[in-house]
């Protein structure tokens, strides 16, 4: 057999070998080829809606503690405690509590579900009776979001909080300021600068203002005296 014949035979054998490999599913991947792995997110985001539904409970005078007393404009039987979910300043889901009038329970649940879905941050949320004498100043300095508290306004009339029809959100970073310079909380002077970008701040036209307004609630940030950035109410 000549050299040319050997080369032709080798070529034919090679072609048959290639066909056999193709019929068997193609050539094997090169040794050391990288494996494709789908990485899981290291910081998974919570679902758009709370995993746990809001829970509504009646309250009595004992449960309200120092936040209620005889002579308040509403009886404990008119109030409800809502346990609901919120996104904290740490970006995680938390459970908190608000006491509100029974007539606005549906509003409040819907509002905080909407704020949860857009991940608006709330630092903490607990009823004011957790603070000595249910002191509003202490709750505000703690940046605590709260609702019912039987307390009067400086004018002597009842605050809408005394009716369970008002909510204060992140009050340290959203302070109250009167024309005479009455600042609440007193530790919030730095946050009178509304160009700051601290989380939890509320600004005109933002998602918090729009969400409350859609349910007929008024924002104290629209008032002229006082200006109350933390405050939302429904009469």
Model-flagged regions — what are they?
Residues 1-28:
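Secretory targeting and sorting signals
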Residues 17, 116, 213:
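Anion (oxyanion) recognition and catalysis
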Residues 19-70:
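N-terminal low-complexity, Pro/Thr-rich disordered segments
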Residues 40-51, 74-75, 105, 213, ...:
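Post-signal peptide N-terminal regions of Sec-secreted extracellular proteins
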Residues 74-140:
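Active-site acidic/histidine clusters and adjacent loop/turn architecture
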Residues 126-163, 176:
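Active-site-adjacent loop/helix surface patches within enzyme catalytic domains
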Residues 152-158, 163-235:
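Catalytic cores and adjacent binding grooves of peptidoglycan-active enzymes
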